[in-house]
Amino acid sequence: MSSEESGKSQSGKKKKRRVRYGEEEIESVEIRYFPNPAPNRDYYVQIRLPELTFKDPVSGYPDFAVATMVYIPDARIVDLKTLKLYFNSFRDKYFSHERITNELFDELLKGLEPKGALLMMEFNPRGNVSTRVVTTTDDAFLEQARNVLELPVTRPAF
């Protein structure tokens, strides 16, 4: 490991770690939105982010998830690069599965203001338990998204 990677200079004194350009982008990211190129047509957008990482709030161990978002744009669509950077900003933050799902969904709804949306988070097994958390703007959109995109999601019957 180089002295730069270890955070120590050759004299053994603690050295200030250099912030890399990707880290700067992630730290300062704001999700951008663009005008919908076809505002008079309803169409579905499916976005899959397979590498979401964050930390468990109890143990501090890393957690991993695949995020799948489906939405019908209204006036805006999301910029994928800034969305990716925004998702990367969660890497060193602490969340429960339910909290991160709802926080991400709320942020996207605020910026997109879509006609309908769904966010499905599939978390890697932890302690031999798999978790899937789904949130949606309404039950009708859940059914639309399921039928159109063949999502393996149904509303549980309680």
Task: Indicate residue ranges for each PLM-predicted region.
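N-terminal intrinsically disordered, cationic/polar leader segments
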Residues: 2-158
